[in-house]
Regions:
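Short, solvent-exposed helix-loop connector elements
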Residues: 330, 336-345, 360-377, 396-399
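Short, conserved catalytic/metal-binding motifs centered on acidic residues
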Residues: 51, 92-106, 133, 196-205, ...
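Active-site-proximal, Lys/Arg-enriched surface segment
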Residues: 68-152, 157-158, 162-163, 297-304
Length: 404
């Protein structure tokens, strides 16, 4: 056992070299592997004190300084993580999954903590929310980025932001989709390769998020609530006959309709998109081409304000065996078949696996500090640890497939 532990520690040190070069000072280069050893190694608690007691007696002050108090820039290390993630799973067949994960907290002093929706509990709870970006190929995810979302109770309180050490560039109020778009820009700037962005309805509901992805010339497939409005793909803009005065504005020749209503007459098919541990995963799917009602708002005829037709997209419905129904939009090409659409929208499940492992095995939610800097450094170390584990997983799989 001791020999195996020593072997993976040596392997970790070799793999970490590009990261250590970005850290600069020799003390930081020495503490980084120690911290990551502590995250990966045995032990129920992955906060600084118990890790120091297990792996580096007397190193508490140095580990604390490395993560919470030391003056060093995380940006170069974050960029290196993106580079390594791309090497592991990047490519045209990869997806970039946008999601968020909650870290439960007590009190009011930890940066970003507030009563807000906690996905793990399915209800409002006192927690921090980290917007996450996961690069994945098939069933192999690599957590590539995390950024803390700040609720209004924080962005409206300058003194509170300053006490928690929130950098000036992150103090303005931003929605989770806006945080995600900024992180996507960082991912793109690092040269990370992926074919499609996928996200749940928490992000897909945002027209600005979808439009932001399209403006960046990205393919996307996102969940939406059932009431999101769409138009027929062949909707036409017409100019009503004016009785007097200025010519009226052009309006759609039909009204927009809720997504769930559009699919009631669609052709539904049983589709298998992946083989899981218990066999093929199946559900009933239907898809039609539509124009999304996310253009400018305008009063149409004698109706209330509606949004004008936006870009063309696929509207996709899913009927699960449990009776649950889900709806999605995707700007994938019109020639995309139903199975490919289903496989793309279901690709986001891998981020849930990554979130679970980051918390249960690597201690993402064990950080006990209160500062912005400390939280993001700890999260970064857990992501690097996770990337190393995925590196070993892929290396092991390759070695098993080598000819004997």
């Amino acid at each position: 056992m001791a020999g195996r532990i020593l072997d993976w520690r040596k392997e970790l040190e070799r793999w970490l070299r590009p990261f250590l070069e970005r850290l600069g000072h020799k003390t930081r280069r020495r503490m980084c592997p120690v911290y990551i050893w502590g995250l990966i190694g045995p032990g129920d608690r992955k906060s600084i004190q118990p890790m120091a007691e297990r792996i580096a007696l007397g190193a508490y002050d140095q580990l604390h300084h490395f993560v919470s108090a030391g003056v060093w820039d995380v940006a170069p290390v974050e960029t290196e993580l993106l580079i390594q993630a791309d090497k592991l799973v990047g490519g045209r067949d990869a997806v970039l999954v946008i999601d968020d994960t909650a870290v439960l907290k007590k009190g009011t002093h930890s940066v970003g903590v507030a009563p807000q929706y906690c996905s793990a509990l399915g209800k409002i709870a006192n927690c921090q929310t980290l917007v996450s970006l996961t690069l994945a190929h098939g069933e192999v995810p690599v957590m590539a980025a995390m950024r803390l979302f700040l609720p209004e109770s924080w962005t409206d309180d300058r003194a509170r932001l300053k006490r928690a050490g929130v950098p000036v560039e992150y103090r303005a109020a931003r929605t989770k989709p806006e945080v995600a778009l900024a992180e996507i820009d960082r991912v793109i700037a690092a040269g990370v390769r992926f074919g499609c962005i996928v996200a749940d309805a928490g992000y897909g509901l945002s027209a600005r998020f979808r439009q932001g992805l399209t403006a960046r010339k990205l393919s996307w497939a996102v969940g939406i609530p059932r009431h999101v409005k769409v138009y027929p793909v062949d909707v036409q803009m017409i100019r009503p006959v004016a009785r007097r005065g200025r010519p009226p504005q052009r309006i759609p020749d039909t009204l927009s309709v809720a997504a769930e209503d559009v699919l009631t007459t669609a052709k539904w098919q049983n589709i298998s998109w992946r083989t899981g541990t218990k066999g093929k995963l199946r559900a009933r799917f239907a898809a039609v081409r539509v124009r999304v009602a996310d253009g400018s708002p305008q009063r149409i005829k004698d109706k209330t304000h509606q949004h004008l037709p936006g870009e063309q997209a696929w509207l996709i419905g899913e009927h699960r065996a449990s009776g649950e129904r889900k709806y999605y939009l995707a700007n994938l090409p019109a020639k995309t078949d139903l199975r490919a659409l289903a496989a793309t929208i279901k690709a986001r499940w891998v981020c849930e696996q990554a979130h679970q492992q980051l918390k249960e095995e690597l201690g993402l939610d064990h950080f006990e500090g209160r500062s912005w800097q400390g939280l993001h450094r700890h999260a970064l170390m857990t992501m690097i640890a996770y990337a190393f584990l995925q590196y070993r997983r892929l290396a092991t799989a390759r070695s098993k497939n080598l000819p004997k």
